[in-house]
């Protein structure tokens, strides 16, 4: 059972992704690595995305099938509990490789039917 209306959590995920995209606009991996404020901001938004995914509960798979929800939820635990071993390149790869399909899936789920 989700904590709240699924559309609200989906919107939180979308907003988090869009903020991350704005944070890293014009950066490459090296620029990202050299900007600890941006790294911290991105990690914070990934935590919020993870939490919103957890709040979706089973609705996540129903609303956005085919996405790696276990991994999306798990990145929050990785950032919280292994904070001293977070690899900036892994965070960057998450931004580049994983956020675009997540964003597309969330947009499809939020689109009006028809």
Question: Where are each of the predicted segments found?
Answer:
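Solvent-exposed interaction patches of small proteins and small membrane subunits
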Residues: 1-114
């Amino acid at each position: 059972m989700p904590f709240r209306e699924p559309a609200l959590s989906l919107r939180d995920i979308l907003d988090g992704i869009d903020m991350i995209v704005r944070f890293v606009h014009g950066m490459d991996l090296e620029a990202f690595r050299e900007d600890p404020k941006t790294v911290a901001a991105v990690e914070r938004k990934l935590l919020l995305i993870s939490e919103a995914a957890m709040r979706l509960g089973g609705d996540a798979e129903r609303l956005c099938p085919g996405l790696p929800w276990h991994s999306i939820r798990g990145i929050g635990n990785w950032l919280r509990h292994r904070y001293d071993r977070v690899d900036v390149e892994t965070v960057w790869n998450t931004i580049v490789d994983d956020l675009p399909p997540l964003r597309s899936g969330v947009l499809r789920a939020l689109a009006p039917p028809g």
